[in-house]
Structure formats: C-alpha cells, structure tokens
Amino acid sequence: MAIFFLPTVLSGFAPHSEEVFKSPARFSWSNLTPSELKNRFVGLSTKTNALGKAYFTLEGHKFMIVGGSIHYFRVPREYWKDRLLKLQACGFNTVTTYIPWNLHEQERGKFDFSEILDLEAYVLLAKTIGLWVILRPGPYICAEVDLGGLPSWLLRNPVTDLRTTNKGFIEAVDKYFDHLIPKILPLQYRHGGPVIAVQVENEYGSFQKDRNYMNYLKKALLKRGIVELLLTSDDKDGIQIGSVNGALTTINMNSFTKDSFIKLHKMQSDKPIMIMEYWTGWYDSWGSKHIEKSAEEIRHTVYKFISYGLSFNMYMFHGGTNFGFINGGRYENHHISVVTSYDYDAVLSEAGDYTEKYFKLRKLFASGSARPLPPLPPLIPKAIYPSVNLSFYLPLFDILPYLNQPVMLHTPVTMENLPINNGSGQPFGLVLYETSICSGGSLFASVHDSAQVFLNDQSIGILDENHEVLQIPKIQGCQLLRILVENQGRINYSWRIQSEQKGLKEVVSIDGLLLTNFTIYSLDMKMSFFKRLRSASWRLAPKTYNGPAFYWGILNAGSSPTDTFLHLPNWHYGFVFINGRNLGRYWDIGPQRTLYLPGPWLHPEDNEVIVFEKIEKGFDIQTRKKPQLQECYETGSGLPDAAGDADPC
C-alpha cells in the first residue's frame, strides 16, 4: 500500500493522477471501526518508520483520520442519526464536535446535558453507527457562537481575565471540567468508547496572553482521566504560540498551502500532519453577502490531502443552525452579527440535504475504500404548508405582566450583572430599562448592541455602540423613558471578548444629569414565558403596526409534519417561535431570507407561531421547500416558483 508523505511531495514526487486511488485497501479509514476493534490497549498514536516518515496508528494499525465536523447543539436531536449516517455514507470515519460551555452551564453551577445538549447520547450514537469521535471541549471554542462558547456570567467580574490562569477564570473552568470530564471518561477509546482524541482549548495562538494557560488546561484534562491523544488547533501564524508540550499540534486552513505544512513539519518533524480544520465554506454575517466555495476546489484539495497521506477534518461537514440566541459576532468599526443559518456552504446543507460537494467527495472516497461505502440515507422530505395569518398581537409593553418580576436598581447595570438566575445574570435576549424623566434634552447612553428608545409607548429614536446620544424633545410633566436593548451576539474571538457585556453600560444621563431609579425587565424569551403568554388577552392585529410587538398565529402542518423553510415577506427584524422554540433571528438586510423549521419540532395539525417583530408588521408567513440564503435568484425574478421553491443564484 503506497503512502505519500509531505517531504516527498515538497521535493516534487507527488502523485499526478488518480491512479493511486485504485489500489486495494488504499485507505485504512474503511477497515478500522469501533465495532471491529474489540481489544483496546494503545489508542490513536503517532509513529515514524525507518525512513523517518510519521503516521498515525490505531491499535497498531496505520490509520488516516477522515473527519467531518457536526455540532450536536446545532442539529435537532431527532436528526443526529440522519446526519451521522450521511457522514459515514460519504466515506468519513470520524466526527468532530465542539462542546459549548455557555449552553451547558448558562447559570453558574447549573448544568444542562439534556435533549439537544445530550453530549453522551450523541457520542454513543456515533459509536453505534461506526464512527470515531474527536472532542473539542474548550473551554473556549469560538465556533461563531456567543462569546466563543464562554458563559456570559464570567463577565460579571471585571477583573476576571478570560482565557488566562486568572484565579477567577481557572476556578470556573475547573468546576466545569469537574462536571464535564467524568461524562467523557467512559466514552474514551481505551474504555471501549469512540473518542480517539481530545483538543486542548482552541486557536490560542491568535489570542496568547498567558504562557502558562495551555499547560494548565492540558494538566487539567490529564488529571481528570483523559488518556487519549491530546492535540491543539491553530492557523499557520498561531501554531507555534498555541502549541503545548505533550499535545499534537494540528493546523487550520482555507486551502492547500505548502508553506503552512513546511512550518508545521519543522515544528514536529517526528509527528504526522493533521489538518484539524479545512474550511468547506464560511459563515455568513448580517448585511454581508452569502459566502460560497466551489465543489471542485473542495474535491481537489481533499484529493491532495489524501495523496500526501495527510489526516484531515472538514469544518463543516454539516453546519446546522444557530437556533435561539446562540450566534456570535465580530467587530469591524461596528458590531456585526452572525446569521441564524450555519449552513456554512458545507458538504451537507443546513437541512441535511446532499450537495455537489457531497457527491464529489463520496466518489473520491469510494475510489480508495477497501469496501463499498454504505448506501445513501434517504432525503428528508420538505413541505409547503398553508400561509400563516398572524391575526392577533400584543404590543411590547402589554406583555410586561407576563415577564418575571422586574429588578429595581438605583442605576442600570448590564444584562450579565442583573441580580437574576441565581446570581448569573441574563445570558441572551433583550433587556428593557425604564425610568421617569421630567425634562427633555441630550440623552447619553452607552448601549450594546442596539437600542430602541421610547417616551411612554412612543418611539423617539435608536442608539448603538457608535451612536450614544439622542435628543429628547421637550415634554410636559414627567414621562416614562424606556430603552429596549438587544444582545445581538457577543463577539466570539479576539481580545474584545473581555469587554462584551451587553445592555446599558456606565451612566445614563440627560444634559449631564444622572438618571436613577430604574425598573429593569429581562426578556430572555424562555419557554416558560411563552406558556404564560398563552393566558394573555391577545388583540386582533391591525393591517399595519409600527413598533415592537408579538404576533400570534397557527401553522397547520397536517397529519405528518416534516421540514420546511419560513419566509417572512415585509417583516423587518425579529425572532420566530414555534411551539415556544426559538428558530432564531430574521433581518431584512439579508443575506438570509428564510428560517429553517425542522419537522420534529412541529405537532400534527395545529402549531403555535409567535413572531416578535421590533419595527413594523409584515404580511402572512409563507413556507418553502428550499432555503434562500442570499439575495438573488437564477430566474432574476426575486420570487419563488409555483412550487414554493426559490433557487438562489
């Protein structure tokens, strides 16, 4: 069996045709599976042969990692099996996933590993299917999620330096690991599980602030019983700084770049090269264009990886969805939010559909597999349902009695510092600040990320991080000043994570005079809130309405609900909740124009639809069989066809 190594490649002896794929048992990924390796002693290891060429072994057998990323927390639990089977049927042998601390411990000391967050069930399902698993537990993960996966309550203490050996941060990490790692231990390879490697932190080379931090985390994993191969993950500029003794250094990249491999090989010439992230596409941001990457480029790059004997993981194989408020953001002179869809232009679409990339890769992998690839799992059908007439509504200020008890404070605090949720503050959503004012003037308020300002129930303007001053007109008597602030997703990388508190910061003043005596409402939009809202006195919705409001309607899904995509014509900005589940944000600045609605989240027949729209009421909600992730169509019409399909160009 011919194996090609990078030093050979770089000296000009790379294979020049796909004939190398025709040799029997070309790749070990199809031979070594969790069900076939019963007697386990060694696990995933690295070796060098007599010529000094390094390679991976699994239980002593040469092994190539052919991995794909699927994040369990971005996929409905009912579809985990479908996505993993499609990964295997494409020819992959390994699934990788991040573990989001901020979702598992939203409140300090209160852990959630249920439903879509059931990590153990996900890993065991992968084992049953026949896949190996690489876990990436952070504590920081980036992943384009809010605060890079760090819980927002860490921001309550301004002296807590994130991603360092700062006492407050490390104590929190230790308590989290004390709860998380025992769940991982029995899932490890040497204990009969499918986990063959565990990553230490994530891309620390681009952040590096504390030379002791990575070593501390490595020891934290080891002393709690992690026995499988440890690795780090950075781009070419960060591999040196982000590495740690005792862990394999892996690299992240957008394309096949010789310089990157040479740099990594010089660092650890006795170790095999592993591409921990080969980016199959990229994430989208609100107000930007939808990003795509050609299927042929992906196929050609993966062909090179395999020809050169490189193990790799494709990020993402299946991106899924940023359900709820979990999306992250970035900063480029202003805050930019990641969109709801995490389609990523990945190998498998957001809804789990096959793509051109999938079929090209499957053909490539099949040509070198020692056995036939599994048959393709069937596609999940999509449906078009009757339009949803949102016939009832409640203006924002009418729902205040259905929220949790408000907080009364002398001066406002950020959402993280609200004295709620057992001292953990508010992680996601919106906050409404109210106080009485008796004169107009120049209002100053430092808001993050965006705010609508009202006098009583009348909108008077907006604020954001770059616009902190608003002129309030002269008023008669005293009136209620209301400031509705939304967290649009905390920045998920860079030094800015340290100061990502949301809500109202610092003082609020009019003409320099400090405003006091605030009533503060938490709008975290949890399921319990929507249950209470069912008892509200909903009003008949007018044809048009300006301002933030909740709208109610019914989606009839028939007797056998299945997937669909929601299209919200003439709605501007808000969130959609189906039976109390938050599908995520919509925004008319694009590029995303539809929201993915998984069939398992629908009941037979009637389903409650609630839309929280911040700006202006739109028309009936429509459903489609295909998503619209960008602005234009092949037809140029900008409209779906008669079947409800809309193929973006």
From Swiss-Prot:
Molecular functions (GO terms): beta-galactosidase activity
Keywords for this protein: Glycosidase, Hydrolase
EC primary class: hydrolase
One Pfam family in the UniProt entry: BetaGal_ABD_1
Alphabetical list of Gene3D superfamilies matching this protein: Galactose-binding domain-like (2.60.120.260), Glycosidases (3.20.20.80)
Chain ranges passing through the membrane: none
InterPro entries given in the database record: B-gal_1-like, BetaGal1-like_ABD1, BetaGal_gal-bd, Galactose-bd-like_sf, Gly_Hdrlase_35_cat, Glyco_hydro_35_CS, Glycoside_Hdrlase_35, Glycoside_hydrolase_SF
Enzyme Commission numbers on file: 3.2.1.-
SUPFAM superfamilies: (Trans)glycosidases, Galactose-binding domain-like
Active-site residue numbers: E203, E277
Superkingdom of this protein's organism: Eukaryota
GO BP of this protein: carbohydrate metabolic process
Protein family (similarity comment): Belongs to the glycosyl hydrolase 35 family.
Protein name: Beta-galactosidase-1-like protein 3
Organism: Mus musculus (Mouse)
Gene this chain is encoded by: Glb1l3
